[in-house]
Amino acid sequence: MVAEGLCQCYIRRMSTGGPHGAAPDRSCLARDTEGRSPCKNCQGCTQGAADPIPIRILMADSDVEQAPSVSVLPRNKILILAPAGKAYQAEVIRDLFNIEASESDRIVRDVKWSNKYYEVDLDLYIDSYESLQTWGAEFCSDECADLRDVVAGIFLVFEETEDAETFQQLIEDCHFTDERVLVACDLSSAEHPASLERALEVHDVALVRWRERGTNELGEQQGRERVRELLDIHPWSERMLRMHASTAAALAELDPLQADIPLDSVVTRIKQARERYLEITDVHAADEYAARIAHELTEQLLPE
């Protein structure tokens, strides 16, 4: 796997800045078909199995190019991204996952995400940027296609509106074809134009004011609870999920007619309805539209 192409020397330098100096050499990725050869740049460390680091990888080695796709890895990686020199990621990780991440952490493995229905293991990737535009150009490049494939979600933690606007373009440039948990977590208290939220929603990016609580005028959760909700409803691969006993029993008793309803069509319908709702300027008309959509979905999901 390409993941094995990341030598332990490279992983150490990404995590600690040593032993070869503070600046990691991103080309330290050589491997042979056995996954155990010394890396060309270090000539001393050996390859070991490791998950991909969410930064640009130089695919210059022919055997790296010919290695099987990293997509065989589970898509359970959450990339948490923030400006360099800030500790924003630590706050989000603490509030959302109830764990402490140090400044030197780059990967936090086997983080359990659990609700009353299921449990799933996630890996957190922690990265930062000097320029989000430059970072995005690397991450969205063809060389990082396999890495993007294992990322289930990207959380941008920001204070500057310009970063949220750049994030919108970044997601567009990545051309994701499958659903991801995409969140722009705003730690500031500044007001953003409604056009920004709509522009992000076009690319399925949720704009979340991290420190807000409760629900908004649409009855939707805000702040960290909104992000928890997005993680809960994400369609994780069945082979990753561990259903709680009560959930498994309920699924076993589900009416086969209801079980045949494609969930993705329902989710798409809800997203389209939300976009249309936000475009309606008349409050009364918007409420009528919301009530009609709710009735239609109820008829579809719970037929008499």
UniProtKB/Swiss-Prot annotation:
Keyword annotations of the record: Chromosomal rearrangement
A single GO BP: vesicle-mediated transport
One example GO MF annotation: protein-macromolecule adaptor activity
Name of encoding gene: IRC6
Function comment: Involved in gross chromosomal rearrangements (GCRs) and telomere healing.
Entry's family note: Belongs to the IRC6 family.
UniProt-listed Gene3D superfamilies: 3.40.50.11960
Name of the protein in its database record: Increased recombination centers protein 6
InterPro entries listed in its UniProt record: Irc6
Domain of life: Eukaryota
UniProt source species: Eremothecium gossypii (strain ATCC 10895 / CBS 109.51 / FGSC 9923 / NRRL Y-1056) (Yeast)
